[in-house]
Amino acid sequence: MRYVASYLLAALGGNTSPSAKDIKKILDSVGIEADDDRLDKVISELNGKNIEDVIAQGIGKLASVPAGGAVAVSAAPGSAAPAAGSAPAAAEERKEEKKEESEESDDDMGFGLFD
């Protein structure tokens, strides 16, 4: 990431085709050592490309990635999922009832003033 950021800094600073020397100079200014293999890889991937286009492509790819930890699961129509789903639903209702009871007992913070 540091190499990409340095490349972008150089490109946004007016250098349309930053070299390894340019990127190393940026990294050295903040005390970061450069790995030549990774640096060469970044330069070869980005060299000759329009930075705005690369950023736009990246934003498009990030938009397609699910975020927030939500799991997207879909059952195929006509599958056995609804029949199998009734047992976990009943267990889930029992868990909810137990959870509600425990929440009520926690309202008084365990002191039981009116018990």
UniProtKB/Swiss-Prot annotation:
Record-linked Gene3D superfamilies: 1.10.10.1410
A Pfam cross-reference name: Ribosomal_60s
Residue numbers carrying Phosphoserine: S17, S19, S79, S86, S102, S105
One GO cellular component term: cytosolic large ribosomal subunit
Top-rank taxon, per record: Eukaryota
GO terms, biological process: cytoplasmic translational elongation
N6-succinyllysine modification, residue list: K21
Function: Plays an important role in the elongation step of protein synthesis.
Subunit structure comment from the entry: Heterodimer with RPLP1 at the lateral ribosomal stalk of the large ribosomal subunit.
PANTHER family for the chain: 60S ACIDIC RIBOSOMAL PROTEIN FAMILY MEMBER (PTHR21141), LARGE RIBOSOMAL SUBUNIT PROTEIN P2 (PTHR21141:SF5)
Name this polypeptide is given: Large ribosomal subunit protein P2
Gene that this sequence comes from: RPLP2
